[in-house]
Amino acid sequence: MTQRERQILQLIAANPMISQQELAEALGITRSSVGVHISNLSKKGYIAGKGYVLRSGSYCVVVGGVNVDIGGASFGALVPADSNPGHVTVSLGGVGRNIAHNLALLGQEVKLLSAFGEDIHGQQVAASCQELGIDASHVLRVPGGTTSTYLYIADPQGEMVLAVSDMEICNQITPSYLAANLSTLQNAQVVVTDTNIPRESLVYLAENCTAPLFCDPVSTKKAEKLLPILHRIHTLKPNRVEAELLSGVSITSRQEAEKAARVLLDKGVQRVFLSMGGQGIYAAQADEQLWVDVIPGKMVSTTGCGDSAAAALAWAYMEGLGLEEAARAYVAAGSITMEAAETINPAMSSTLLQSRMGL
């Protein structure tokens, strides 16, 4: 699905009686172009018959953090208590938002459940979601709230010297907020969550969401929130240290990684994709286990590889792919992401991903 098609579907979902002329005016395109897009959506099965009857269950919900990253890198040695000439960058991030962004690039319909303030940064995030075709209509806008912000200062070599993280607004992603959006969650093909949301909200998802639940542990500290709900998780994507925490198994070899995955399966997780860095990915479910090597290539930056991998796993599930193909999608997404300086490689697409997978 193209970004324009996703935008049209969102407008139709909000107003099933909308006319093609109204769609054209809302998107700034011609009526004939709208007709072509609607015809394509009908051929692809997203619109069933006349009257804009939308196919249900064909979307992914991402629950998690939205972040604005503000970074300053000095041109010379940092001088404390002084104004240092340098370069300042502002970029959009957050694990949940990054996963949603990658899924949109992979052609999936995405709905985002998150929270941000009614400040300039919140406006930037909302505009970005609209441009990408991510449905942010269910996002909680907090009056007077500050959109989650990460501020850091780096030296000329790019090493972080000091940082301040303001993610308090993520605490607004409460069980009551999720309950208000339960029908959206229940009708999804898959729900992906990070662990930036409160512990009780993760428990709510585990106990009330009937759609398959995919979890990105994010970090060892935040992964601990998943311990009480492992038995309700469909797909878990830990790295080595996160898997150690969740399984209680010390991992220093492939054999120990396999043991940790077995423990997690015994705890109720249906699928485990355990990253061992350069040693590859161990994918396991009850009746199948395998190793998939990383794809060698030019590495520019590894930032964002985990987020794209989580998106690739959700994409693979939505496309009906098996365990091995999902694992190959995981490593393929990482190889694409690391080729760009940006956290999200704008070249990401389902065509490129499948090519990298060897399909």
Where would I find each of the regions flagged by the language model?
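Alpha-helix/helix-capping structural signal
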Residues: 66, 241-242, 308
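Hydrophobic anchor at the start of a short beta-strand
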Residues: 109-110, 136-137, 213, 272, ...
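Glycine-rich phosphate/adenosyl-contacting loop at the front of the ribokinase-like
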Residues: 3-4, 8-13, 18-26, 30-113, ...
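Conserved beta-alpha-beta core of the PfkB/ribokinase-like small-molecule kinase fold
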Residues: 190-259, 280
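Conserved phosphate-binding/catalytic region of the ribokinase-like
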Residues: 1-20, 26-27, 31-32, 36-55, ...
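Conserved N-terminal subdomain of the carbohydrate kinase-like
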Residues: 56-57, 78-87, 105-189, 353-359
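Short gly/ser/thr-rich secondary-structure transition/capping motifs
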Residues: 43-45, 171-176, 215-221
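Short, conserved phosphate/pyrophosphate- and ester-handling motifs at nucleotide-, phospho-/glycolipid
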Residues: 103, 239, 306
